[in-house]
Amino acid sequence: GIAFTDGDKIRVQNMNRAKKNLATYAYSESTSKWNTSDALYWGVQPTNTFNAWYPATSAYDSFTIPTDQTAGTDTADWMTATTSANRANGAVNLSFNHNLAKVTITIDKWENEYLENERVISSLELSSLSGVMSYNSTLSGDNQAKWVKTYTKDANKSFVAIIAPGTYASATNIMQVYVNGSTTPLAVKTRSNLTVEAGKAYSFKLAIGKDLATITSSVTVGDWGDVDLDNQNATQQ
């Protein structure tokens, strides 16, 4: 998403301290504030550097993309922020960037071979490079494509997943669709070379046939959007 919701947690680190330099902040929707019970202090330097990341259970410089996103994409939305703040001001402003890419898939058409009661998407999976993402959007680990199970936004109609940046050659199997309980998926191939970039949102439209599913129009690309946090405080010490 492009906004934090109630209970979301971020991790913040003061890079100018060796101790009391980490805190987990939880967002309260009722107060529009970030709260912590941890000790996060300023360093003695006039200007301190802060790194932050979401989810709080991940890390600033690496992230493993979950391959099962059927329960939602929040824990897959790896974001990081870094800023320099003035100790005298006492406030830290953070602007989070999405390090991965968001993909939305819409079922645009069912071919006539399907009866109305057969037009059921049992599962839709999206190909993504796997392994551990690093902050500069490179990948370590096995660096192989794996299937990510998407989140169903609208039953039999709309599906969402978050994947790694990367390049797909033309005619690459980028999706597989399981229809009406079938254990044999329909393959979806790219229509041309496709480069997926960090921080972008991609939209695909599919037509579902008996033997294959196809992308029906050009892929739509837009900015995913960044998230700003203003006036978060570290303690003077």
Name these PLM-found stretches.
Residues D61-T67, T183-S192:
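Edge beta-strands of extracellular beta-sandwich domains
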Residues N16-T24, V132-S137, D142-K146, S182-K189:
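Surface-exposed loop/edge segments in extracytoplasmic proteins
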Residues V120-T138:
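Short, surface-exposed alpha-helix to beta-strand junction/turn motifs within ectodomains of secreted
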Residues A76-T82, A187-K210:
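Short beta-strand elements
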Residues N173-M175:
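Short, small/hydrophobic-biased targeting/export segments
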Residues G1-V120, E125, K146-T167, V179, ...:
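Short, low-hydrophobicity acidic/polar segments
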Residues A207-Q237:
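Intrinsically disordered, low-complexity repeat and linker tracts
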